C-alpha cells in the first residue's frame, strides 16, 4: 500500500510519509524538566561510588555550565555530541581524566538514562493513531536526544519501534533539529520527496522550523500554550494525536 498518495484537507498536498518527533509528541515528559535533579543525583551517586569526590551541588552547577557550553559551541553546526561528552567534560573540570568511552562515563550516562525513563509515559492515543496511519503511509521518527540508546529503549518499552520505517536520533548521527540534514536523512531513507511528507512535533523552533526549512509541511501539536516564533508558521495546529486522523486521513 506504500506509494499511495492521499490529498490532505487543509494542508493542500499529497502525502506519502508522516514523520514524528518523539518527546511531548508520542511520549510525554513530566512538565518543568523535573527529571533533571533526580537524574543528576543518580549520575552523581554512580560517580561517587566509583571514586569521584565531588559534592552534588558543585557537580550540578558544573554540569549545566558544560551542557550550555556544548550547545553554544554547536549553535551554528547543530551537531549533537553524545551525552558522554558532557559527563567526560564535567569530570575533567574537577581534574578527573576519563574519556567518553571509559566505563565510568558510559556507566554514568546509563544510570542517568535509567532514571530519566521513569519520567516518560506513552501518550494514550499514540499506538492507535500510529497503527492506523501505518496502514496508508510510511512512518518515520526524528528525535533530538543526546542519549540515543535511551530513545531505542523507550521505543521498545512502549512498543513503538515496529511502526517506523526509519528512526533517527540526534545523539546517534551527531546532528539535531532544526538542521535540515536530519530531516533529509529521514526522507532519503524513506525514498520520498520533501513535498510528499508531513512532520508532526511540539516545538515551533525545532520541529516546525526544521521541517519547513527542508520543504516538509509541518503540523504543530500544541499540548500547552507555546511561544510562537513569528517567522515560523505551522501548516496546521492540533491539540492531540487523534486529530491527525482527521487532518491526514479525512480526504
Predicted region positions:
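Short acidic alpha-helix initiation/capping motifs at coil-to-helix transition points
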Residues: 34-43, 80-91, 145-146
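Short, acidic loop-to-helix structural element flanking the phosphoryl-transfer center
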Residues: 77-85, 100-104, 110-139
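A metal-dependent, Asp-based hydrolase signature
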Residues: 57-110
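A short, structure-level motif marking secondary-structure boundaries and short turns
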Residues: 28-30, 71-73, 113-116, 136-137, ...
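Conserved phosphoryl-transfer catalytic core
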Residues: 23, 35-74
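Charged catalytic carboxylate motif
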Residues: 39-42, 86, 125, 129, ...
Amino acid at each position: 500500500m506504500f506509494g499511495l498518495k492521499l490529498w490532505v484537507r487543509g494542508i493542500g498536498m499529497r502525502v506519502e510519509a508522516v514523520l514524528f518527533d518523539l518527546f511531548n509528541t508520542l511520549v510525554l515528559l513530566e512538565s518543568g524538566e523535573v527529571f533533571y535533579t533526580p537524574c543528576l543525583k543518580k549520575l552523581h551517586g554512580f560517580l561517587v561510588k566509583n571514586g569521584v569526590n565531588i559534592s552534588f551541588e558543585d557537580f550540578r552547577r558544573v554540569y549545566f555550565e558544560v551542557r550550555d557550553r556544548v550547545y553554544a559551541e554547536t549553535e551554528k553546526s547543530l551537531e549533537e555530541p553524545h551525552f558522554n561528552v558532557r559527563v567526560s567534560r564535567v569530570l575533567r573540570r574537577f581534574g578527573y581524566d576519563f574519556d567518553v568511552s571509559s566505563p565510568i562515563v558510559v556507566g554514568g550516562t546509563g544510570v542517568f538514562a535509567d532514571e530519566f525513563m521513569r519520567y516518560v509515559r506513552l501518550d494514550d492515543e499514540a499506538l492507535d493513531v500510529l497503527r492506523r496511519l501505518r496502514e496508508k503511509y510510511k512512518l518515520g521518527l526524528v528525535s533530538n536526544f543526546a542519549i540515543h540508546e535511551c530513545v531505542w529503549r523507550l521505543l521498545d518499552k512502549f512498543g513503538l519501534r515496529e511502526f517506523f520505517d526509519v528512526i533517527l536520533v540526534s545523539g546517534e548521527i551527531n546532528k539535531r533539529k532544526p538542521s535540515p540534514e536530519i530531516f533529509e536523512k529521514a526522507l532519503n531513507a524513506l525514498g520520498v520527496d520533501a513535498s510528499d511528507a508531513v512532520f508532526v512535533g511540539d516545538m515551533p523552533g525545532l520541529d516546525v522550523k526544521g521541517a519547513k526549512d527542508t520543504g516538509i509541511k509541518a503540523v504543530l501539536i500544541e499540548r500547552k500554550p507555546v511561544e510562537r516564533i513569528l517567522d515560523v508558521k505551522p501548516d496546521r495546529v492540533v491539540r492531540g494525536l487523534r486529530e491527525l486522523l482527521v487532518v491526514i486521513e479525512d480526504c
